[in-house]
Amino acid sequence: MECRERRLAADLIALSSVEGLPVSEAAKRLCMTRQGLYKLLKQLRAEGYVAEGSVVKLTPKGRDFLSGILRDLLRYFNIASIRLVGRVVSGLGEGAFYISLEGYKRAIEERLGFTPFPGTLNIKLDPQYMPYRRYLDGLPGVVIPGFSNGLRTYGAVKAFRARVNGVEGAVVMPERTHHPTDVIEVVAPVKLRDALGLRDGDVVEVEVLL
């Protein structure tokens, strides 16, 4: 990594810790003067790493840069799992429909080793865990192939074995989804809301096995 890239990495890591904060508050948290932070933000905005606005926010380019660093670090340290934390949110009920389809159900049984409860647990991730979520996009995972029932074609799903508060399951990432990127879906052999006594807003921890 060149000197400029090392400096950029340090700056973006620091800024990621204060995303969403006004510049004045972010400067205090980072032990910087407002003038110093404004100067840094101006430079990084010009390079496309930080978004315009009154609060600190990385652009997709900035997040992709950090995701690349994370990927290299996890590979170097041979990390076997990552931890995601978020809050339970309600979905639209689509998970129950899709998981109950024979094509998906059978493939999950064959490739993940369990019969899925017909439904998914939706978790909205805390912002600081988004670099880890984006890291999963670049991994192969376990592919649940798409299929057609003669009337409609259903897309492939990438999955990662996982534990939700200790309960075995899998994070599923459909190639077609209505969820924003900060919401993940988890399938399991049991109804996770009941098994773990979860309600909307409850904090959950997901250990994703790589």
UniProtKB/Swiss-Prot annotation:
MF annotations from Gene Ontology: magnesium ion binding; nucleotide binding; riboflavin kinase activity
UniProt EC number: 2.7.1.161
Region (H-T-H motif-like): 1-81
Gene giving rise to this polypeptide: ribK
Phylogenetic placement of the source organism: Archaea, Thermoproteota, Thermoprotei, Thermoproteales, Thermoproteaceae
Keywords linked to the UniProt accession: Flavoprotein, FMN, Kinase, Magnesium, Metal-binding, Nucleotide-binding, Transferase
HAMAP family reported for this sequence: Riboflavin_kinase
Catalysis: reaction(s): riboflavin + CTP = CDP + FMN + H(+)
Required cofactor(s): Mg(2+)
Pfam families (UniProt xref): CTP-dep_RFKase
Record-listed CDP binding positions: G91, L92, G93, E94, G95, A96, V190, K191, L192, R193
Annotated region (Riboflavin kinase), positions in chain: 82-210
Keyword Cytoplasm: no
Family: Belongs to the archaeal riboflavin kinase family.
Positions of Mg(2+) binding: T120, N122
GO process terms (BP): FMN biosynthetic process; riboflavin biosynthetic process
Organism: Pyrobaculum arsenaticum (strain DSM 13514 / JCM 11321 / PZ6)
UniProt-recorded name of the protein: Riboflavin kinase
Tagged with keyword Metal-binding: yes
